[in-house]
Amino acid sequence: VKQLKTRPANYLLRLTHHPTIPSPLTLFCLREAATASTTYPLTSPTMTTVLTPQIDSLQTSLEAKGVKYALASYVDIHGMCKAKMVPIAHLGQMMTGSELFTGAALDGVPQDVSDEEVAAMPDANSATVLPWNPEVAWFASDLYLEGRPFEACCRGILKQMLAKATDMGFTFNLGIETEFFILKENLDGSFGPVSDRDSLDKPCYDLPGLLDNYPWITEIVDYMNQLGWDVYSFDHEDANGQFETDFAYSDALTMADRLTFFRLMVKEVARKYGYFASFMPKPFANRTGSGAHYNMSLADVNSGQNLFENPNDPLSCKLSNLGYQFIAGVLRHAKAICAVTCPTVNSYKRLLRQGSMSGFTWAPVYICYGNNNRTNMLRIPLAGGRVECRAADISTNLYLGAAMILAAGLEGIREGLDPGEPHTENMYNYSLEDLKAMNIDMLPRTLQEAIDTFEADPLSKTVMGPLMYQTYIDFRRQEWEDYHTHISDWELKRYLKFF
């Protein structure tokens, strides 16, 4: 009882889920905690193990499909899955927060070893049976601490921003173009494409390269369609061993859950075939990097109507005034956004005009927008009605990236910002002097520069909250320092015998 009166939430959670504590004691603890004077209100749904009809129905449905285990999964600062596995008979407990995690054991979770554990609260709507292992179901989860939403939960940060969009009457819809590498490791420790024929300087849309990878890529596509994601296209991309899948957009939270699951699924399928999947932004200096272009629109929260559509757009982009205001907000905060949508040291080796044997990197370099023109940071595709952010790579933590870019876009709408005229020309052809005269700035050149602008932009703390804001800065700065103090092979080759 003494512990309950000081820190009841997680302690009570342990009691109510403890198999050896008699029911009367559990009830006594509940009564004492309810009357205790505490700064931790007992409002969390983690305080009960009662199976609601929804959870009971879900468990029955999963058991009928042959599911034996469930995963309470969440992401760390990288957007990588972390989880505990629970027998399906204990699904009710898992769904009410029984699975606790020590945050100090993870990257970018701001907790000390002496802190209380965070509890994973699974979202029943995210239940996904693993297509490659149908005995297991995966659940995206929010993190709770002391009975309250954990401030540094990536999924929770996105949900808070989506709630603000809802208050303004909007649903944020999002589609992601998933680019990635599937590679094999050779006996000498080197790695390269699966197919020996995948060696062209311009391998984009290469049919032999696609057909040689038919078994694993069609297995992934079949799984995606089995899950209801509606894949409408997939192809060999512009680098050897690189591929892209395109599937239907959804609301932003669902898409963030799906991208998280997608990366897990692709890695598992590739491993089955003896290969490995890489979501590193640019693994080869002379090849195109892997993007994760954000295709964005706002819909009316009640009718679902796309509010970015305007077939009579005087600027000929088929975009509404609301869409242009959204663009202006994103451009205003582009550098800070880049620190999250391009989160690694390696990310900035993708954001170059040159650096691919195919002739182009296809990546943005400047903070500008335009029509169906891939040299802009923000592109409005030919059909209009949506905005594509090209300054995002496949290593992105989509929960955080979507939250940042949505916040910027909503600011543009609230303030009625104007992005100016769209750029239809090849932006790669301009010199720095030309761009300066046009008042067009460059995207960050390094992670250090991106984090500096992220730290200086007030929007970052507003979106992330003070705890995650500082954690993100500290973590990425340390990543930069680790890289900056490393002596590379390039340096040794260039300088060791030269001086």
For the regions a protein language model found, what residue spans apply to each?
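Cationic, low-complexity basic patches in intrinsically disordered or flexible, solvent-exposed regions
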Residues: 3-4
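Intrinsic-disorder-associated, low-complexity terminal segments enriched in Asp/Asn/His/Tyr and depleted
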Residues: 10-11, 17-18, 40
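ATP/Mg2+-dependent ligation/transfer catalytic cores
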Residues: 44-233, 250, 255-261, 275, ...
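Catalytic-core signal marking the mid-to-C-terminal active-site face
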Residues: 56, 261, 268-271, 275-277, ...
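Short glycine/proline-enriched loop/turn "hinge" motifs that connect secondary-structure elements
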Residues: 128-135, 171-173, 234-239, 287, ...
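Histidine-centered divalent-metal-coordination microenvironment in nucleic-acid enzymes
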Residues: 179-191, 236, 240-250, 280-304
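Short, contiguous, pocket-lining structural segments
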Residues: 208-216, 233-239, 251-262, 266, ...
